[in-house]
């Protein structure tokens, strides 16, 4: 009885609510375009397929409940992922029906290439790459490194040879004179790639006669240079120009302070005398 009375009292309220719902639904249908409907359908289809293939907790790393063989799949290992999906190459995009599989093609093969898990160091030995190689191949080798000197060097300060091993000299005089004489008496292998000067060893290797000849040639060249006054500071360099003669017209000229004092050993090549 009470319900009938309330319905009889407010008949217009229900009518207004019904009209409002119809108006809003009509506005919503008109506002939808074909592009929006297509995007909505594609998103719904994608979520449905992902929900069908993926279980709850698939992306949760620390979830102990999702400890099944198909839940904790390494996303990097493509071959393992295909094996866990019963041989399928693309479990995410697979559909239950044949028409769905035809309408949703799998990803390209290049994106699913399985790389080898083997790794190691890579060495490059010269060359010009894939182009024509005009230079000889050079491979660095550590077999030619210089050996230790004979006798060996003194031990560093604080070095314990009994516990740390080695072949250095423990008892020695730690002075500059001893170090200079000791290094001069050592027989060391000289390496041109790791040492500054190997001239003494090269001259000793070529033989005594050729070593004396090289030293004689060097002395002759030095003597010729001294006779030609190449080391004379006061000598004029080639293309130095004529000596400057005093000019009476420059007596009243403004003196440049930067030209006073000692002249630096710098001369402008083919420079002209300019007066302002």
Curated annotation (Swiss-Prot):
Disulfide bonds: 155-168
Location (main, coarse): secreted
A biological-process GO annotation: neuropeptide signaling pathway
Localization in the cell: Secreted
Keywords: Chaperone, Disulfide bond, Secreted, Signal, Transport
Complex formation: Interacts with amon/PC2 early in the secretory pathway. Dissociation occurs at later stages.
Family label: Belongs to the 7B2 family.
Function in brief: Acts as a molecular chaperone for neuroendocrine convertase amon/PC2, preventing its premature activation in the regulated secretory pathway. Binds to inactive amon in the endoplasmic reticulum and facilitates its transport from there to later compartments of the secretory pathway where it is proteolytically matured and activated. Also required for cleavage of amon.
Protein name: Neuroendocrine protein 7B2
Source organism: Drosophila melanogaster (Fruit fly)
Taxonomy of the source species: Eukaryota, Metazoa, Ecdysozoa, Arthropoda, Hexapoda
């Amino acid at each position: 009885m009470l319900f009938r009375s309330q319905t009889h009292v407010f008949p217009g309220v229900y009518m207004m609510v019904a009209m409002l719902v119809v108006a809003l639904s009509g506005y919503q249908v008109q506002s939808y375009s074909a592009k929006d409907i297509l995007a909505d359908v594609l998103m719904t289809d994608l979520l449905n397929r992902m929900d069908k293939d993926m279980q709850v907790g698939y992306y949760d790393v620390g979830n102990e409940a999702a400890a099944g063989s198909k839940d904790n799949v390494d996303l990097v290992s493509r071959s393992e992922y295909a094996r866990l999906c019963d041989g399928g190459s693309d479990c995410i995009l697979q559909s239950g029906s044949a028409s769905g599989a035809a309408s949703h093609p799998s990803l390209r093969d290049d994106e699913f290439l399985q790389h080898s898990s083997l790794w190691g160091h890579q060495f490059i030995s010269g060359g010009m790459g894939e182009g024509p190689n005009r230079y000889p191949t050079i491979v660095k080798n550590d077999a030619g490194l210089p050996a230790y000197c004979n006798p060996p060097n003194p031990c560093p300060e604080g070095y314990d040879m009994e516990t740390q091993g080695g072949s250095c000299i423990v008892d020695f005089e730690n002075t500059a004179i001893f170090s200079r004489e000791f290094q001069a008496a050592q027989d060391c292998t000289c390496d041109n790639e790791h040492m500054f000067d190997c001239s003494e060893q090269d001259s000793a290797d070529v033989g005594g006669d050729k070593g004396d000849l090289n030293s004689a040639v060097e002395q002759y060249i030095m003597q010729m240079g001294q006779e030609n006054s190449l080391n004379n500071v006061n000598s004029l360099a080639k293309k130095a120009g004529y000596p400057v003669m005093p000019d009476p017209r420059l007596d009243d000229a403004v003196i440049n302070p930067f030209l006073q004092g000692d002249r630096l050993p710098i001369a402008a090549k083919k420079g002209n005398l300019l007066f302002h």
